[in-house]
C-alpha cells in the first residue's frame, strides 16, 4: 500500500500540464528556478508551488548554489513509476512498440 500511496503523488504531479512542461524542460539538464519561471507566463510563486509538488513527488531534485536553487529531473523515479504502471495495465508488446516508436521519432527530430 505504501508504494501505491507514493505513486499517487507522482500521478497527481503529472496531472498538471505546467508541471509536465517543467519536467520536459528539465530533460535538457539542470535549470535554476528563475530560468524555469522565465519559460512560463505565470507568477514566480506559482512556479515555486509547482516545483514544490514535483519535489514532494520525488520527480525533481534541488541543490543550492550560492543564492540560486538548481533543479534536475529525477529520471529514475519517473521511469520506475511509469514503468510499473504500464507493466500493470498494458501488454508488454504495446509498451515496447510505443517506446520504440517514440525513441525513433525523437531521433529524427534531432
Specify the residue positions occupied by each region the protein language model found.
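Intrinsic disorder/low-complexity segments
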Residues: 43-45, 49, 107
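Amphipathic alpha-helical dimerization/coiled-coil segments
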Residues: 1-6, 27, 74-110
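Intrinsically disordered, low-complexity regions of eukaryotic proteins
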Residues: 18, 64, 107-110
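Residue-level detector of secondary-structure transition/capping positions
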Residues: 30-31, 55, 86
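N-terminal helix-turn-helix DNA-binding core of bacterial DNA-binding proteins
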Residues: 2-45, 67-78
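Beta-hairpin "wing" of winged helix-turn-helix
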Residues: 55-65, 72
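Alpha-helical residues within the helix-turn-helix
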Residues: 38, 49, 55-56
Amino acid at each position: 500500500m505504501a508504494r501505491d500511496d507514493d505513486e499517487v503523488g507522482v500521478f497527481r504531479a503529472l496531472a498538471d500540464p505546467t508541471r509536465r512542461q517543467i519536467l520536459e524542460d528539465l530533460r535538457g539538464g539542470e535549470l535554476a528556478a528563475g530560468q524555469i519561471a522565465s519559460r512560463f507566463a505565470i507568477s514566480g510563486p506559482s512556479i515555486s508551488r509547482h516545483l514544490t509538488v514535483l519535489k514532494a513527488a520525488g520527480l525533481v531534485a534541488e541543490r543550492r548554489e550560492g543564492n540560486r536553487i538548481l533543479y534536475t529531473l529525477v529520471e529514475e523515479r519517473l521511469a520506475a513509476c511509469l514503468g510499473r504502471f504500464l507493466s500493470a495495465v498494458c501488454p508488454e508488446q504495446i509498451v515496447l512498440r510505443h517506446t520504440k516508436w517514440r525513441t525513433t521519432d525523437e531521433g529524427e527530430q534531432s
